[in-house]
C-alpha cells in the first residue's frame, strides 16, 4: 500500500516538532520536553513511551519508528496534530 502523501507530511511535521535539535531522531529528553507542553508527564511515562516506540533499542526514535507508531495510533496522532 502506497503512503498517503498528506499523512506522511503530517507525520514529518509532528516529528520535527519533537526533534528539537533537528538531528533526525528524537531523544528521551526531547520527547519529555515536548510532552510537557501537552501537560504533566512523569519520567516513568517517558521511559515507557520510549520503550514502546524505540523498537531497535538505540535510545532514540527514528522517523521510521515514529511513523510505525503513528500508523498504529492514528487517533492519538490526530489529537497531537491539532495541538501542534
From Swiss-Prot:
Disulfide bonds, paired cysteine numbers: none
Binding site for Ca(2+) 2: 54, 56, 58, 65
SMART domains per the UniProt record, alphabetical: EFh
GO cellular component, as recorded: endomembrane system; membrane
Tissue specificity remark: Expressed exclusively in mature pollen.
Keywords linked to the UniProt accession: Allergen, Calcium, Membrane, Metal-binding, Repeat
Domain of life: Eukaryota
Binding of Ca(2+) 1, residues: 19, 21, 23, 25, 30
Pfam families: EF-hand_7
Domain EF-hand: 6-40, 41-76
Gene Ontology terms, MF aspect: calcium ion binding
CDD domains: EFh
Record localization: Endomembrane system
Record's keyword annotation contains Calcium: yes
Primary localisation category: membrane
PANTHER family: EF-HAND CALCIUM-BINDING DOMAIN CONTAINING PROTEIN
Protein name in the entry: Polcalcin Ole e 3
